[in-house]
Amino acid sequence: MSGLGDDTRIANAFALPSGDILVTDRLVELAKKPEELDAILLHEIGHVVHRHGMRQIIQSSALTIILMLVIGDVGAVEEWTLALPGFLLESNYSQGFETEADEYAFKRMIAMDRDPAYFGHMLGRITGEGREAAEDKAVQDPGSEGWLRYLSSHPGSPARVEQARRYSEIFNAGRLQ
């Protein structure tokens, strides 16, 4: 990925509000089949179709305005605890966007005669790499793991892999008829 430097080894893809989709080299390397990369790209296209980037900007701005109205001056907020509820609410919105993008990808894959299990396979590989980093963090700070799920912008990977499996069953049942 241009601009991130040669040492970027994070497997990721993301959609910008402009509709551009950026993919890291590491994500491409992790894909064992083209269908796996297609699944991730369809997920990102789901973000573009549903305008998640723009909606996130609007929601973030609205939360800032509400915080200003309640507190008076956001610049004067030095206590992170005052900003935490807004951050948690925003993380919840992000998780909803991720679920919506997943659903878009699964439905498009079925329409294209591709098994949604490819998404689950790829997500498992991506989170396997991320899990190693999280385990390192948990060793350094054992109390951090429980809080991470509340601060995450993505739903838990096991639930997403399970959803891909359910859509895969629908896909395979349709092929048998």
Please state what every model-predicted region is:
Residues M1-L176:
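A Zn2+-metalloprotease active-site environment signal
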